[in-house]
A protein has these predicted regions:
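Terminal, compositionally biased segments used for targeting/anchoring and flexible tails
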Residues: 5, 75-76, 93, 110, ...
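Alpha-helical adaptor scaffolds
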Residues: 21-25, 37-95
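Long, contiguous interaction/recruitment modules in multidomain scaffold/adaptor proteins
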Residues: 1-38, 143
Length: 143
């Protein structure tokens, strides 16, 4: 019995530590969102900050706001395959498969080639089983 109690205590300590770590991560994320938001108020086209802010908004689950950032990045960097890839992810997270597939195709046309990551990226879960997604991979993966 004492052994089971010890395991239980260790588990609760681990849970508390994990909760503290998650809380610290969220506090850091909130800080960054505020900090980078202020920078963008002064310089709305600061590409490096936009990239970080878009990623942070997505991590926070604020997908619609992340989409707006990703759209702006594509406007600022129309030939950047990563900007298009991130925009495709935003569309997929918002369950907009037509736009996600179209934008993902554009990312690949512009040179995005990390197909292994594309297959595993959780942001693309909503389109992973779409025949157009599989077709896109078949078309470009071996070129």
């Amino acid at each position: 019995m004492a052994h089971q109690g010890k395991q239980s205590n260790e588990g609760s300590e681990h849970t508390s530590t994990s909760s503290l770590a998650r809380s610290a991560d969220q506090n850091q994320l909130d800080f960054e969102l505020d900090f980078y938001g202020r920078i963008l108020e002064r310089n709305p086209n600061y590409v490096d900050v936009l990239r970080v802010q878009g990623n942070n908004l997505t991590r926070k689950g604020r997908f619609a706001e992340g989409l707006q950032i990703d759209k702006r990045l594509v406007q600022l960097r129309p030939a950047d395959p990563l900007a298009h890839y991130n925009l495709a992810c935003s569309y997929a997270l918002l369950k907009r498969p037509d736009q996600a597939i179209k934008t993902l195709r554009r990312a690949v046309e512009l040179g995005y080639r990390d197909f292994r990551y594309m297959r595993e990226d959780r942001d693309l879960d909503s389109i992973r089983h779409d025949p157009r997604f599989r077709q896109l991979l078949r078309e470009y993966e071996n070129h």
